[in-house]
Structure formats: C-alpha cells, structure tokens
Design a protein with these regions (language model features):
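Short helix-capping segments at alpha-helix termini
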Residues: 8-15, 86-94, 141-146, 165-170
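Extracellular/periplasmic Venus flytrap/periplasmic-binding protein
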Residues: 26-28, 36-144, 181-187
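Ligand-binding clamshell of periplasmic/extracellular solute-binding protein-like
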Residues: 1-2, 21-29, 126-134, 151-161, ...
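Short, solvent-exposed loop/turn and secondary-structure capping segments
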Residues: 2-4, 31-32, 78-79, 137, ...
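Extracellular/periplasmic periplasmic-binding protein-like sensory domains
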Residues: 35, 42, 140-190
Length: 190
C-alpha cells in the first residue's frame, strides 16, 4: 500500500494522499521502502524485538528459545530480527527451533507445539496475531507446554480470551504501544 500511495502521489501532483498506517510494523516500511507519504503510529518490528530482547537480558532462566512465526514478510522479519538480537544480547541462549507456518491457514497447532515441546524450549518468541496466536496458545495449553511466551500481538483479537481460557496468564508477555498520559504536571506545560 505504501508503494501504491507513493506512485499515486507522483502521478497526481496537488492531490497527494497520506498513508496513516496503524498496524503494519514490517521494518521495510521505515527502511528500504520508506516514503514521505507513509506515517506509522506503531513501533516497527525491530523496536518491539529490541524491547523483548532487552528484557530477556535480565532473565537468566531463559536458556532455550523457539521461534515460530507466520510465513509472510512480517513473520520472516520477526524471526530474522529475533535471531540477530538474541545473538547480540544473549549469546548464551540457544535457538532450538525456527519455524514458519502458513498465514491464517492452520486450525490445529498441535504438531507445531509437539516440536516446541520436544525441543526443550523454555521460551517461545512469536509475531503471530489473530487466530494464529489464539490457536497456538490453545494448543500449547492442551499439550501442557509450560514455556514463557513473548509476543507482539497476544493482546490483540482472540489473544486475551485464549490466555484466560487456557490458564496461561503469567506465561504470555506482550509488547504493546500506548501513552498512559501519566506525565507529571510539569511535562504537560507548554
């Protein structure tokens, strides 16, 4: 969409449009495909992974990480960034699995969870969203997988319900954007 907006604006001077992007966090949109006409509200994928891996630096119990992501540009980016940042910040951590699955086509994640469980992973990192995160967490609970989960979108549609229904509260950690508007009064002055 960002490419389309840029091309449209090039062809229609004086009738330019601006692409307000709420949720596409692929790094390419603010790197190699950066456009003056694109404005993103959310942090990009690298910023989110930097938050996760910076936190993981403080978690000595994390020894084995499994990466599972949706097979499209975003999921491929998450796996690449996660592997690079873990290597940089936690070289002692072993990546015991790195899996891509079809986007929004899997209805039973049990085979994927079996691989995660067999790998001995104590932590799972995923960019999954929508039904893919909900069904992934449900399958994890059904299989008794007690790993910690670090996610970009477990707080999105279906995620909180899945976490509640599966008893994984306290095991699923999610990166969210927001402004609690709790700045001190002095910061609110012009």
């Amino acid at each position: 969409l960002s490419d389309f907006v840029t091309k449209f604006n090039d062809r229609n001077p004086g009738k330019e449009v601006l692409y307000f992007n709420y949720a596409a966090v692929d790094d390419a949109l603010t790197n190699e495909k950066c456009s003056f006409w694109h404005f993103r509200w959310d942090a990009n994928s690298s910023i989110k992974m930097a938050a996760i891996t910076t936190y993981l630096k403080t978690q000595p119990d994390v020894k084995k990480v499994y990466l599972i992501n949706q097979d499209y540009s975003f999921g491929q980016g998450v796996r690449k960034i996660a592997a690079a940042m873990l290597k940089e910040k936690r070289p002692d951590v072993q990546i015991v699995g790195d899996e891509l699955h079809p986007l929004l086509k899997i209805t039973d994640f049990a085979p994927y969870i079996a691989k995660i469980k067999a790998s001995g992973a104590d932590t799972v990192i995923t960019g999954n969203w929508g039904q893919d995160i909900a069904l992934l967490l449900k399958a994890a609970a059904d299989a008794g997988l007690q790993a910690n989960w670090f996610s970009y979108y477990a707080g999105g549609a279906g995620g909180p319900t899945a976490i509640k229904q599966t008893g994984l509260a306290g095991k699923v950690h999610d990166i969210v954007e927001g402004d609690p508007n709790t700045a001190p009064e002095a910061a609110q002055k012009e």
